[in-house]
Amino acid sequence: MPVGEGSHHNKILGVRGEDLAAAYLERLRYRIIDRNFRCRGGEVDIVARDGKTLVFVEVKTRRTAGYGVPQLAVTPFKQRQISKAALAWLTRKGMLDVNARFDVIAITILSPDAPRIEHITNAFELAY
């Protein structure tokens, strides 16, 4: 594989996973508010509303189980990055007084026709 090609394929896989996750959430009647919010300290893949609760969603996608289950990639360090981005998002929107939670959607695409989606609600607490 040429240099850089792996990261390109990983980016495509990540976008595919985020699209699958957004569609999954919409089927559950979540309302997608924002996607791929980035700030200096981190990134949030999806910001959605589940009723009156604001949900910050981290999406992890894998093509194989060889690297372990996708949700294990949401390490304490990654949780801190997501938390920083969520606080930045809330601050910019003037929404620091809303109910919010952090979910993880783990997607394994062993076959293009049958991705496995696991949704973990309240996956972690706000981390500093």
From Swiss-Prot:
It comes from the Bacteria. SUPFAM superfamilies: Restriction endonuclease-like. GO terms for molecular function: nucleic acid binding. Pfam families: UPF0102. InterPro entries: Restrct_endonuc-II-like, tRNA_endonuc-like_dom_sf, UPF0102_YraN-like. Coiled coil: none annotated. PANTHER family: UPF0102 PROTEIN YRAN. HAMAP family: UPF0102. Belongs to the UPF0102 family. This is UPF0102 protein GSU0650. It comes from Geobacter sulfurreducens (strain ATCC 51573 / DSM 12127 / PCA). The lineage of its organism: Bacteria, Pseudomonadati, Thermodesulfobacteriota, Desulfuromonadia, Geobacterales.
